[in-house]
């Protein structure tokens, strides 16, 4: 059915969230055996990201310029500058454009989001805009406070996304946002459930964004950053490992015995950590010919990792 597994996905340092389900992966390693069925291009968002978005469209002419949308993955201090111009001419070269600075601050369980006044202008600029803020969470907040132009705005809780978009100054706790909204009616794919982590969505009334800044405060912010792959507990032994198959010019394959209590295995070579390997063998690719390598293998679970087992390998 087009199901697939992706290997060799490098994640830089930091915490990375699978955009399609909310699972968190630690960076500084290469993840493997990642489930990626035919509909899913692997997309990871670094915690702390501020993402500008627009309404679903098939053409830029369908974008609603009277509504701006920001999706946040709060983590520490984050800043983002939103750039905008007429999208048609080269007048931006002579300064006809606008920018909006957004700042997110998470201290313990208090989140503060500041959207500054938009600076600059261009022909056709829509200054009177509503604002939608989507915050990725694990549970509903304890309290929400919004201000526009320094004045507190009363927020009304609603129970559906449709009600949110038709209600000024409202918020909605979406327990399971559904991505599968555009499948062909009656198709098998329409039945596929594609849900992610909860979101708190806030819809603020239209205001002159060049004159009024926005501040949003959330108390009780929570986001589960535990590794979803780590479930087992208990002591781990260093794997009994060996090289598998004949020597080759560009690859080396290591194999090992299955370890009780192991959730996955890691292989380190040339300072690169290949992680989330759930099978008991792994082929390292893109090596240099006629080169000796130290290959290290260990088992991992939620309690920690085993000692490394070191192998010597050589390409031909």
Task: Go through each PLM region and give its residues.
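Short beta-strand elements bearing conserved aromatic residues within extracellular beta-rich modules
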Residues: 144, 265-267
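Short beta-strand segments within Ig-like beta-sandwich modules, predominantly Fibronectin type-III
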Residues: 272-279
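Exposed aromatic-hydrophobic patches
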Residues: 203-205, 281-287
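Beta-strand-rich modules
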Residues: 284-303
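Short acidic/polar inter-strand loop motif in beta-rich domains
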Residues: 220-226, 302-305
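Extracellular Ig-like/FN3 beta-sandwich strand-entry sites
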Residues: 211, 262, 290-292
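Pro/Thr/Ser/Gly-rich low-complexity, intrinsically disordered linker/stalk tracts
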Residues: 230-260, 289, 303-316
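Catalytic core of carbohydrate-active enzymes
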Residues: 1-151, 155-191, 195-216, 220-222
């Amino acid at each position: 059915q087009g199901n697939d597994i992706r290997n060799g996905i490098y994640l830089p340092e930091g915490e990375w969230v699978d955009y399609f389900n909310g699972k968190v992966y630690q960076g500084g390693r290469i993840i493997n055996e990642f489930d990626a069925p035919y509909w899913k291009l692997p997309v990871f968002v670094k915690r702390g990201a501020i993402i500008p978005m627009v309404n679903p469209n098939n053409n830029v002419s369908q974008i609603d310029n009277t509504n701006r949308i920001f999706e946040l993955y709060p983590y520490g201090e984050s800043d983002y500058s939103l750039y905008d111009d007429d999208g048609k001419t080269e007048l931006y070269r002579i300064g006809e454009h606008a920018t909006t600075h957004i700042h997110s601050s998470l201290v313990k369980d208090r989140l503060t989001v500041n959207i500054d006044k938009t600076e600059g202008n261009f022909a056709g600029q829509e200054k009177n805009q509503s604002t939608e803020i989507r915050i990725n969470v694990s549970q509903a907040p304890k309290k929400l406070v919004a201000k526009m132009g320094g004045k507190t705005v009363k927020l009304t809780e609603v129970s559906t996304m449709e009600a949110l978009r038709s209600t000024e100054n409202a918020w909605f706790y979406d327990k399971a946002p559904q991505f599968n909204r555009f499948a062909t009616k009656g198709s098998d794919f329409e039945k596929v459930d594609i849900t992610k982590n909860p979101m708190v969505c806030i819809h603020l009334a239209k205001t002159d964004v060049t004159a009024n800044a926005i501040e949003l405060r959330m108390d009780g912010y929570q986001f589960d950053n535990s590794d979803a792959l780590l479930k087992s507990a208990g002591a781990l032994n260093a794997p009994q490992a060996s090289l598998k198959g004949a020597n080759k010019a560009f690859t080396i394959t290591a194999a090992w015995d299955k370890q009780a209590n192991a959730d996955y295995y890691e292989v380190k070579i040339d300072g690169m950590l290949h992680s989330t390997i759930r099978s008991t063998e792994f082929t390292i690719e893109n090596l240099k010919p006629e080169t000796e390598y130290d290959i290290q293998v260990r088992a991992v679970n939620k309690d920690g990792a085993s000692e490394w087992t070191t192998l010597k390998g050589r390409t031909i």
